[in-house]
Design a protein with these regions (language model features):
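Secretory targeting and sorting signals
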Residues: 1-33
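Post-signal peptide N-terminal regions of Sec-secreted extracellular proteins
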Residues: 32-153
Length: 153
């Protein structure tokens, strides 16, 4: 497996990262070792990643939201998780998990179906998701992409 987790630096950076992916080899001991969650938020923690399954050579997008203990006691949900592919700097949505199962007291997560990363070996992949939280009648929604991309196969 060739897997490269790169910081987002625009289309040129994505092309450079794709070129570097052919020379960088990371061999995790399990599929979960390749997950690198990017998170933010204090009272409500929002996290997302592109997960690599070494056995099947596939990517999938994952997102989760958690009401942090000692925070504001929010209800939370995550929706519209997307796995995006970036061929030549263009964005193409490859998989979507809508996950409209409602509000949750402490946490929610969603995962897209997988895609064969070897079909597009030089493209970078990103995750985007919509995170929502509410307390009483007041609620907030944020759609977020971690400032990272993944290249692999």
């Amino acid at each position: 497996m060739k897997l490269k987790h790169v910081g987002r630096v625009g289309a040129t950076g994505g092309l450079v990262a794709a070129a570097l992916a052919t020379s960088v080899v990371i061999a995790p001991s399990s599929a979960s070792a390749a997950d690198s969650w990017q998170c933010y938020g204090k009272e409500v923690r929002r996290c997302a990643t592109v997960s690599w399954d070494n056995a099947s050579k596939t990517f999938r997008a994952k997102a989760k939201i958690t009401d942090v203990a000692g925070g504001g006691d929010y209800q939370v949900k995550v929706t519209n998780v997307k796995l995006e592919r970036y061929p030549a700097g263009k964005r193409v949505t490859m998989r979507t998990a809508q996950d409209y199962d409602g509000w949750h007291g402490t946490g929610d997560s969603a995962t897209t179906s997988s895609i064969n990363a070897c079909k597009y070996p030089h493209d970078s992949y990103r995750v985007v998701a919509t995170f929502s939280w509410k307390k009483g009648k007041a609620s907030e929604d944020r759609t977020w992409r971690p400032d990272m991309s993944w290249v692999g196969c």
